[in-house]
Every structure is written in structure tokens, then in C-alpha cells.
Amino acid sequence: MAKQLIYDVKAREALLSGVNILADAVKVTLGPKGRNVVIEKAFGGPTVTKDGVTVAKEIELEDKFENMGAQMVKEVASKTSDVAGDGTTTATILAQSIYYEGSKLVAAGANPMALKRGIEKAVQVVVDELKKISKPTKDQKEIAQVGTISANNDPTIGNIIAEAMNKVGKEGVITVEEAKAMETTLEVVEGMQFDRGYISPYFVTDPEKMEVLLNEPLILINEKKISNMKDLLPVLEQIAKMGRPLLIIAEDVEGEALATLVVNKLRGTLHVCAVKAPGFGDRRKAMLDDIAILTGGQVISEEKGIKLESVGLNDLGKAKTIRIDKDNTTIVDGAGDRKALEGRVRQIRTQIDETTSDYDREKLQERLAKMVGGVAVISVGAATETEMKEKKARVEDALNATRAAVEEGIVPGGGVAYLRCLGALGAVNLEGDEKLGLNIVKRALEEPARQIAMNAGEEGSVIVQRVKSETGAFGFDAETSQFCDLIEAGVIDPTKVTRTALLNAASVSALMLTTECMVSEIPKEDKGAPAGMGGMPPGGGMY
């Protein structure tokens, strides 16, 4: 396949054009008075969003060289979203500014490699300064403020997220779902919950709610299928004498074993319920071990040399209550040994640190939360599906931002944190083109504050100069169009988001500045449709 190449100024101009097209579409969404972007979908109605990364991901340009520039900035937004969960629009604006200023200097004869070194040194100084400015989140109120800002100044979302974090802790799992109703609600599940319900509806104890409630039950955890009744009989006889309820967790319970359990339940001989084991493969084994440690039981497994027919009461787990519906099982207050539980938690934390897979990390964090905190579910409600999707995206953004704030602390919002780093850059001594690279970063750090002011209908440069003339958290609150102490006003950003946005923007922009040649495939020309069959009279085709 033949390729087309462009060099030098033409290459950088094409890149800049692509960067500008994408960044101009994204930056209108920045700040409390940022505008929405409407995106056409192949199926269904259009999507309305104010989320930078959602806009960026939809942009694909016709010109192949311009598209490369757009895709590289899209990578900045995506990477920032993956690492910090928010700050995608800020990262895009910073990338555009660094590349725009840098490409002018390269065109004027500056050395791109020296510029790159200067940019990298300047960014490191800013990152260190941000860490100095950063303050840890003190209370639920500050967490709510971070959530509110990230959810485009929606205090309802901020408060719900703060309440969820307060209830399940820093490591608790918070999931976001679409609600059936109009209201946005929070439900907290205490204890360990896994997504397996009862195998047979005949086990139900509350027909109105279609739930099974077991008080002070014993728990039999079996790795394999149970289909033969005679294997179960010895342990069932011991439990029947005690008169306590029993929960059986196994790969499956079927045939004769299931029929016998159902008959005994209906007769009232045995208060029992059976559920399938959660997860698959190795993850299933790990989750069964988690349940065993949480409840103080044993996993009945041939690998461990324990057979079902030889199980005693000491091998069974215990809990205060277990609630089972058709989809979920919740174990509350397991009777496991505290030290064993702490050891398991340490082991899972180590695995989280060592894993390189995002999917595995997410699953390990879910397991950790089930062991230590519990699970909170935020159900997002709205009047229409379009509004619900937009609101759900805002809730997810706000959730990521609050997690980042708890992790690394907070800095003043509204682009002020970047402006407060300018003093540290002024104290850095660099020579030649490296100094020009530092000046590029200085100029770029003003852009987020300038854009927030412009989106609010103010003169950006005037606002930036006024904020630069003051110190600390003094800044412009675009929501009220007032100058004030932003931390007191609740306009705060997570340090992790602010830091990650700059690092990713500088990394990609500096790479683009050192580009000297671009290569792409030559677009194929569509050939006309083949001519029709000649020589036949009108209407003389085949029937």
C-alpha cells in the first residue's frame, strides 16, 4: 500500500490544526458555566454531554494528518480519565496551549529537543509545587464540595457521594446504576454481598418480598456440584438436631439433592437455602475462600483433602443474618477470626499493588471492599433517558474526583492552583531554548483559568491578571462571578486530577513538538459502480 508523507512545517501545521479542532470542541464544556455538546449517535437519540473525554472520543477527522493530531490529544484526555477519573477538559486545554506556543517557537528556529527538556523540567517543578499547596480532605463537607464541582455544580450529587463514602469508607465499593424512578437515591449494603440468588423459589421465607431470611445460620461452602443426597446426609442430620438454619453455597445443587432439600424445607424439617457460588474459575476459588474466612468456615474441596460426607459442624461458617433474593446474597456480621480476616485483607491489598491489569485490579478492589467496608449503590434517576445518561456520566466523574481527593488531597479550584505555581517557575534558572520551554509551560498554566472565565462570559485575561496579583486560594468563582477565597467557597479540585492533567498534556505535546515527518496511507478513490448489463431491450431482463 502506497503512503503519503509530509515534512517539517507542513507536518506540524497539520498536527496543530487537528489539535485545535478537537480542543475547541472540548474546551467549551469547562467550568460551572461551560456549555453542552450534542453528539449524534448511529442508533437512538443524540447524546448531550458536558464531559470532555466523551466529546473527545467521538471526534474523528477526515484529513488523515489532522486526525493524527486530534487522536494524540484524545489520548491525553483518555489517559487522564483512566488515571484520575476527571480533569479531561483541563488536560486537553493544557495540551493545546503547550503545542500551539511550542510550534510557533520551532517555526522561528528554536531547537525542539531543548524545548522538550525545558517543558519536562518546568512540569516537574509545578508537580512538586502542587504537592506543597495540597491539603488533605478534612471532613465529609469537603468531599461533598469536590463531588459538587466535578458534577457541574450539582450539590445533590456531591452530597450523595460524600454520604456513600462516609458509610462504606475509602476502600468501599460505590457503584452507579440507572434508577427506574425519577429520584437519585443511595442504598448501602452492609456485609458481604455477591450476585447469586436462591437456586429454587421454594426456599423463600417471605413470599411478599420473595426473599429468604436466615437468622444465626450455619454455612456450608462446597467447591463442586452437589447432586447426590447421601454425601449431604451426615451433616444435614447434625444440623436438623440443632434446629439452626443452613445456607449451602456450591457450584450447583441439582437432581436428588435439590429435590430432598426442597421437600424438607416445605415440610419444616429443615430451614435451608442453596445458592450457586459467585465468580468463575480461579476467581471463584478466591471468593469462596473470602466467604470462608469472613464466616469462620472451611471450603469443602478435594484439593484440601476434605470430603463432603466427612464434614463436621466445625467446618461450617456462621453469621448473624443472611438475606437472599432472586439475584443477590448478603451475609451480615460473619463470625470469622479477626486476625485471619486482617491477614486476608493484607494479601488482597498486596495483589492490588502488584497487578498490571485494570480489570483484575477492579475485581480485587471489589473483593477488598466486601471484606472491610460494604457496598454503596447510587441509583441515578431522571425524567428522560437522555437526561439520565448525562446525569449518570456526571455522577461517575464526581465519584472518581472524590476518590482522587481522598487519595492525594485538594488544591484551590478554578485553575488557581496552576497560577500559584508560576512563582516557583520564576525561580528556576534555565538557559537558551530550555528557558523558552519553561516559558511555554508558564503561558499554558494560565489557560484553564482564562477558559473558565471566558465560558462564564468574562474577559479571561483581565480575570487571570487579577488572580495572579493576589495569593493563596484567592480566585474567581465563575458560578457567582465573584472574587473570593475558593477553598472557603467550596471551589476545590483533587490534587491528583490537577497533577495528572498537566503531566499527560506535557508528555504528548512535547512529543508532537519533536515531530519532523508524518506518514499516512493514501486515501482510496471510490471507483464508480459497474455498468449495467448491455444489449437487453427495456423490460427484457430475466423473470
Swiss-Prot record:
Residues noted as binding ATP in the record, renumbered to the chain: 29-32, 50, 86-90, 414, 493
Q: Where in the cell is it found?
A: Cytoplasm
Q: Where does this protein have compositionally biased stretches of type Gly residues?
A: 531-543
Q: Which PROSITE patterns match?
A: CHAPERONINS_CPN60 (PS00296)
Instruction: Provide the Gene Ontology terms for cellular component.
Output: cytoplasm
Known EC number: 5.6.1.7
Q: Where is this region: Disordered?
A: 524-543
A Gene Ontology molecular function term for this protein is:
ATP-dependent protein folding chaperone
Q: Which Pfam families match?
A: Cpn60_TCP1
**Gene3D superfamilies xrefs:** GroEL (3.50.7.10), GroEL-like equatorial domain (1.10.560.10), TCP-1-like chaperonin intermediate domain (3.30.260.10)
> SUPFAM superfamilies from the xrefs?
GroEL apical domain-like (SSF52029), GroEL equatorial domain-like (SSF48592), GroEL-intermediate domain like (SSF54849)
| Subunit structure as annotated in this protein's UniProt entry | Forms a cylinder of 14 subunits composed of two heptameric rings stacked back-to-back. Interacts with the co-chaperonin GroES.
* NCBIfam families in the record: GroEL, PRK00013.1, PRK12849.1, PRK12850.1, PRK12851.1
Family of the protein in this entry: Belongs to the chaperonin (HSP60) family.
Task: Kindly provide the name given to this protein in its UniProt entry.
Answer: Chaperonin GroEL 1
Q: Which organism is it from?
A: Syntrophobacter fumaroxidans (strain DSM 10017 / MPOB)
Taxonomic placement = Bacteria, Pseudomonadati, Thermodesulfobacteriota, Syntrophobacteria, Syntrophobacterales
